[in-house]
């Protein structure tokens, strides 16, 4: 009701509350955070829920090297909503945040910080700088997470650099080594020349690069099987044609691989013959822009060419022709340039031919060595151009095409990587792959496509390269015999290293000599010697984070193994989800989690990836400054986070409007609960009006929907249910209809409405508490309390559906009453347009009804029916009349109400002036004022 200057204003029960319309969250939230810290909210919550069933959400550790971004905020808020909800659903749900603290980015930052001195500092000094950098960022990120409203044990997070963590990680390594899953060997691995270290598959990202696709011919030098002579082909004029996009690998060429299942043809160009797959002749000739050629003789099976020899294109050596199933007809020539030192398929096929050497003419920094001949000293990317130019000049290049293709890059420095065969430590996935498949089947994957995605990744992956040639990390706990070089790992050495790390941390590896660490009495299994050196590599950081199931879940008393849930972004299928799964299955034989929940990426409003250079990013700090953290939390809840989530200033502006409607619903109720004491003023259910019971039934439906949403972590469903309840059921209907009862009366009707609103607000506030953690607490602080209610809303139990449920007949009745109301509103709008009425209280409505509609409407007292329509007078007439409506058997007519307008309630009534002392009031208002 609008404010009306009148002598009777003071007699109205207008809403009154200190709960502000403007949220002011950026200022209020820090005050609440201080209160939560001062009162140790998290630990008090854990104590409050002690003895209840546990729900363990295991935190995947973010990397401790920078400020949080919107993706991090999305991740942490989803987790916090789950944690808060579970603690309100009858569980004790602890949250131990973690941080991934080792690895290359921090090491590079540390090296950058010392400038020119980096060549002079020791490994131990570098590690100390790295630890300081990581620790500082842990504090920064923890504060930023807490600013988002995330509750957890931030005073005691788990850190992968802690001695007890490193010790347990060494034990996991030892358990896997004991089972034969860890080995050292020469294999091609992803190698970053800029970071000078091996990389795992999880550390690779793909980006578009330009390159030259070239066809190169190699001259046949030996034909031990007499294939050429058999077909009348002169060997001195015959070539194998290969295709490659990595020109720099040609110095490493030791073989050409054909497929024994394919047929090959001799293609005559001029007086020279070129061998290529029969099915690819035309595509090769087209690519090389060769029009005049001739296929000579019949096709020859690929098997006949095995073990022929050819001359290298520029080096003084011969290569071998070999066979491999990996050769396809999808592109190229059917003759594959094979450099076992620079490709997995190449390496594997070369292992079948002992006579084919593995050559690696590239050093750690990506520079060609003396094995590359005249190109030694050139970086591989530059060598692409010079080698191509020289081979073109010599006539070895038959054709070239400049192409764009997806090429692997290092996810740390974002530069292109290479394949390079080096001695590395590996985890042999093949030895326990079937066990991993079985473990995957025991996990609940959300969304369910996660099951097939993980299984496919495990099926397709190679052995896991777990060693890195860097300093900042957990050392590989291996010793080497000084005499014969054999590596040495035993139960005793693992225990010695683990005990040392638990006592002094992994820095101890760099403080002591091998003889000071390895237990006395250890001898080399191969030669019996007992003098040792230490391994110089560190473990892949994915082995660090992949060990959390042991180092955290099994070690922290408030946690347990396995976790009920791991929840991270989709990129973690190749990262933490997978590394945890592999180490857990390898060491324990089971998955480390019962369920996995996956979220998408955060993109801009046009669904494009956010980049600083593009200027399309938004930072959590900016949104918090403008709107408050609760708006970010509402953004998370309003999104379908199982796919990519859009974020932008326009989106947050729209969400702030949605938030305002939820907030104002609570504010209206709080205003009308002024002076209401739920301990003494609540009325019994039989004193409620039907519309009150309808409102509580709508609340019960809300409980059903939000409970279902929370149960499957569908917060989007929770948000929409809450928003629709506040806007449609409450603001647009119930709260509007009850205004007259609330403002203008003091009796049982008002108490019934207040009782209803109180029950609604208590339940609604609990429902929104996991999402709007700050606003819900603010509402809770202003809410009148009954005995036994907690100081903090998160300590309360989530309301259970069923206590206000209505039967289907009641719901159907009120659905029809609301439909009638909607039809009345249409007619009132028309009357307003025709200037018959202004406000709806100026109207008198006549409802023409058939028997069924008449009985429906007549079951409601006429004054309540008028309030339902927000008009002054309602008349029911059996029969036809008025404007036809969408409700069968109903006609509606509107006229100006009879009588005069009451100065206090603004309704029109013929009873105005019936009380001499109050000539401008209706009889009802006069009696209220006189009471």
Segments and roles (model prediction):
Residues 321-322, 885-920:
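C-terminal accessory/binding modules appended to enzymatic or scaffolding proteins
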Residues 100, 189, 193, 199-207, ...:
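Acidic, turn-prone loop/beta-hairpin segments
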Residues 49, 53-60, 70-74, 78, ...:
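Secondary-structure capping and boundary motifs in well-ordered enzyme cores
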Residues 196, 469, 485, 528-529, ...:
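Cys/His-coordinated zinc-binding microdomains
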Residues 47-109, 242-251, 257, 322-349, ...:
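N-terminal catalytic cores of NTP/NDP-binding nucleotidyl/phosphoryl-transfer enzymes
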Residues 192, 410, 481, 524-527, ...:
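Short cysteine-rich clusters marking metal-coordination/redox-active sites
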Residues 2-25, 31, 35-39, 111-251, ...:
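Residue patterns forming the tRNA-binding/recognition surfaces of aminoacyl-tRNA synthetases
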Residues 189, 407, 478, 521, ...:
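Residues immediately within or flanking Cys/His clusters that coordinate Zn2+
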């Amino acid at each position: 009701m609008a404010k009306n200057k009148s002598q009777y204003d003071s007699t109205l029960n207008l809403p009154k509350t200190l709960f502000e319309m403007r949220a002011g969250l950026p200022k209020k939230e820090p005050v609440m955070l201080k209160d939560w810290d001062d009162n140790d909210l998290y630990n008090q919550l854990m104590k409050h829920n002690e003895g209840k069933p546990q729900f363990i959400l295991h935190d995947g550790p973010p990397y401790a090297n920078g400020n949080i971004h919107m993706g991090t905020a999305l991740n942490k808020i989803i987790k916090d909503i789950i944690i808060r909800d579970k603690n309100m659903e009858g569980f004790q749900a602890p949250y131990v945040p973690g941080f991934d603290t080792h690895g290359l980015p921090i090491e590079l930052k540390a090296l950058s910080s010392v400038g020119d001195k980096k060549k002079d500092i020791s490994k131990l000094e570098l590690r100390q700088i790295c630890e300081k950098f990581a620790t500082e960022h842990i504090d920064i990120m923890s504060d930023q997470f807490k600013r988002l409203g995330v509750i957890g044990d931030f005073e005691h997070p788990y850190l992968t650099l802690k001695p007890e963590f490193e010790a347990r990680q060494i034990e996991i390594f030892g358990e896997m080594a004991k089972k034969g899953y860890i080995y050292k060997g020469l294999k091609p691995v992803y190698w970053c020349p800029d970071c000078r270290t091996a990389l795992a598959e999880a550390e690779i990202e793909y980006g578009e690069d330009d390159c030259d696709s070239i066809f190169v011919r190699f001259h046949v030098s030996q034909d031990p099987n007499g294939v050429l002579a058999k077909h009348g082909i002169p060997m001195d004029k015959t070539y194998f044609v290969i295709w490659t996009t990595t020109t720099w690998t040609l110095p490493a060429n030791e073989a050409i691989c054909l497929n024994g299942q394919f047929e090959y043809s001799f293609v005559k160009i001029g007086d020279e013959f070129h061998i290529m797959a029969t099915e690819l002749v035309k595509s090769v000739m087209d690519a090389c822009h060769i029009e005049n050629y001739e296929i000579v003789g019949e096709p020859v099976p690929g098997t006949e060419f095995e073990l022929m020899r050819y001359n290298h294109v520029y080096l003084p050596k011969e290569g071998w022709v070999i066979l491999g199933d990996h050769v396809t007809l999808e592109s190229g020539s059917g003759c594959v340039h094979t450099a076992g030192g620079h490709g997995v398929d190449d390496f594997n096929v070369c292992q079948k031919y002992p006579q084919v050497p593995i050559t690696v003419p590239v050093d750690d920094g990506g520079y060609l060595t003396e094995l590359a001949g005249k190109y030694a000293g050139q970086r591989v990317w530059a060598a692409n151009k010079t080698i191509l130019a020289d081979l073109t000049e010599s006539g070895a290049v038959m054709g070239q095409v400049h192409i764009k293709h997806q090429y692997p890059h290092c996810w740390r420095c974002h530069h292109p990587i290479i394949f390079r065969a080096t001695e590395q430590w590996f985890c042999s996935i093949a030895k326990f792959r079937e066990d991993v498949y079985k473990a995957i089947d025991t996990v609940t994957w959300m969304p369910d496509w996660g099951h097939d995605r993980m299984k496919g990744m495990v099926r397709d992956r190679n052995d896991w390269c777990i060693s890195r040639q860097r300093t900042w990390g957990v050392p590989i706990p291996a010793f080497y015999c000084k005499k014969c070089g054999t590596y040495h790992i035993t139960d005793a050495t693992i225990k010695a290293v683990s005990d040392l790390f638990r006592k002094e941390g992994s820095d101890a590896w760099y403080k002591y000599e091998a003889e000071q660490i390895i237990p006395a009495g250890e001898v080399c299994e191969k030669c019996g010697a007992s003098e040792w050196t230490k391994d110089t590599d560190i473990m892949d950081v994915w082995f660090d984070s992949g060990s959390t199931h042991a180092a955290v879940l099994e070690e922290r008393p408030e946690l347990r193994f396995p976790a009920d849930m791991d929840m991270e972004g989709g990129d973690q299928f190749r990262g933490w989800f997978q590394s945890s799964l592999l180490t857990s299955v390898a060491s324990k034989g089971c998955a480390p989690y019962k369920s996995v929940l996956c979220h998408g990426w955060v993109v801009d409003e046009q669904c494009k990836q956010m980049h600083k250079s593009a200027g399309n990013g938004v930072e959590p700090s900016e949104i918090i400054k403008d709107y408050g953290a609760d708006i970010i939390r509402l953004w998370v809840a309003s999104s379908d986070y199982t796919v990519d989530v859009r974020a932008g200033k326009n989106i947050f502006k729209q969400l702030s409007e949605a938030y305002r409607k939820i907030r104002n619903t609570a504010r209206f109720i709080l205003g009308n609960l002024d002076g209401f004491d739920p301990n003494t003023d609540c009325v019994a259910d039989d004193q409620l009006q039907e519309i009150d019971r309808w409102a509580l039934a709508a609340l019960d439906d809300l409980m059903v929907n939000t409970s279902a949403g929370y149960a499957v972590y569908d917060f989007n469903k929770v948000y929409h249910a809450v928003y629709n309840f506040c806007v449609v059921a409450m603001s647009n209907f119930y709260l509007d209809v009850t205004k007259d009862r609330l403002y203008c009366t003091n009796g049982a009707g008002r108490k019934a409405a207040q009782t209803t609103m109180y029950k609604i607000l208590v339940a609604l506030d609990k429902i929104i508490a996991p999402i709007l953690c700050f606003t819900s607490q603010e509402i809770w602080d202003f809410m009148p309390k009954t005995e036994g209610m907690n100081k903090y809303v998160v300590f309360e139990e989530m309301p259970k559906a069923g206590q206000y449920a209505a039967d289907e007949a009641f719901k159907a009745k009120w659905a029809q009453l609301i439909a009638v109301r909607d039809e009345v509103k249409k007619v009132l709008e028309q009357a307003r347009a025709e200037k018959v009425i202004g406000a709806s209280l100026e109207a008198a409505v006549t409802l023409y009804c058939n028997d069924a509609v008449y009985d429906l409407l007549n079951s409601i007292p006429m004054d309540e029916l008028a309030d339902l329509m927000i008009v002054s007078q309602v008349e029911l007439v059996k029969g036809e009349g008025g404007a036809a409506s969408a409700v069968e058997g109903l006609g509606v007519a509107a006229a100006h109400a009879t009588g005069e307008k009451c100065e206090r309630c603004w309704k029109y009534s013929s009873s105005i002036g019936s009380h001499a002392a109050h000539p401008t009031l209706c009889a009802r208002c006069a009696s209220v004022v006189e009471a």
